[in-house]
Amino acid sequence: MKIVFAGTPEFAAQAMRAIHAAGHEIVLALTQPDRRAGRGMHLQASPVKEFALEKNIPVLQPETLRRNNKDPEKQQQAEDAYRALINTNFDAMVVVAYGLILPQEILDITQQAPRFGSFNIHASLLPRWRGAAPIQRAIEAGDAKTGVCIMQMEAGLDTGDVVLTADLAIASDETSSSLHDRLAALGAGLIVDALSLLQDGKGLSRTPQPALGVTYAEKILKAEADLDWSLSAREIDARIRAFNPFPGAISNLNAETIKLWKSRLADEDAYSEAGPIGAVIGFSEDGVFVRCGDGVIEILEAQKPGGKKMNAKTCLQSVDAPEKLLCFQTKA
C-alpha cells in the first residue's frame, strides 16, 4: 500500500520503520519543523524526518495545516501541504504523535474513494486518556493496565472509532520511559496489522467509543514536578515514575533542588521511625526512606543540580544539613 505518514517523535518513527519494513511504500512524510535542542541549542530534525531522509521519502514540515492562517509564510506552508496531499497517489494516511491538528479538509482528502482514510495510533485504551500525555497520566493515576488503539480519525480530539486495540499490564516499577518503549513497539505492530487487513480486502470493523469512561490526559507541565509530600506514598511513587524522563520529579532538600528519578513503596512497619512529613527517616543499601502523608517511600535514584544521576543514599548524604536532619520541603 502507498502511505502518507505524519508524525514527529521516536514513538512515531518506530511505527514508520515498521510500516516500511512490512513492504508498504511511504510516499510522503509530514513532520514538525526542526527544533533547537541540546546544550548547544542546535537545530535538530525529528526522528521521523531522519528516517524519511534515510529512505529518500519526500518530507514536508509545515508549522500549521490551517490554510486560513493570518501569517503569510505559515499560510503558504499549509497550502503547499494541502496541494501535496491532493497531488499524491496514496491509499491511507497514518498519524502518530504528529503534534499538529488535522483540519477537516485534510481528513476529507484522505477519505476520497478509493482511499481508506486516516488512522491514528493512540497510546491508551480509549476513551480513557484522550489527549497529549496518555502514558504519563496512566502511571500517575495508578492504572493497572493500558494499551494502544488504532483509531479512524475525525475532527474531534481522539474521538474517532476504534478499529484495533491491544493492552498490556503496567508494572509496579514502570516509568514513562519504559512504558513509552513498550507501547511504541505494540503500536508499531498493531498498525502493520491494520494495514495488512486493508490490503487483503478484509476491512476493519469500526467500534464507536463509549460515552462513559472518558478521561483527558492533559499535557504535563513542569510545575507539576514539584512533589507534595503530604500525599500518600503510593501517589508520590506514581508521580516520580510518571515524570521520568520528563519533567523529572523535584523537591527542595535543605535549600537544594533535588531531582528524584526512581522510587518504590517501602514497608512502613519496618521503618516506623517518627519524623515530619518529608523527613528522611532511614537509609537502605542504595536508597533513603522518606515519610509521606500516608506511608513511607524509598527513593532509589536522585540527582543534585549540575550533577549526575546516582543512588539516592550517596546523593543525599552529601547534602549539607544542620544536625544531619534531612527533610524535603513539601509543596506549598
From Swiss-Prot:
Protein name (Swiss-Prot/TrEMBL): Methionyl-tRNA formyltransferase
Summary of the function given for this chain in its UniProt record: Attaches a formyl group to the free amino group of methionyl-tRNA(fMet). The formyl group appears to play a dual role in the initiator identity of N-formylmethionyl-tRNA by promoting its recognition by IF2 and preventing the misappropriation of this tRNA by the elongation apparatus.
Protein's UniProt keywords contain Signal: no
A single MF term (Gene Ontology): methionyl-tRNA formyltransferase activity
Catalytic activity line of the entry: L-methionyl-tRNA(fMet) + (6R)-10-formyltetrahydrofolate = N-formyl-L-methionyl-tRNA(fMet) + (6S)-5,6,7,8-tetrahydrofolate + H(+)
Residue sites binding (6S)-5,6,7,8-tetrahydrofolate per the record: S124, L125, L126, P127
Family statement: Belongs to the Fmt family.
Lineage: Bacteria, Pseudomonadati, Pseudomonadota, Betaproteobacteria, Burkholderiales
Gene3D superfamilies recorded: 3.40.50.12230
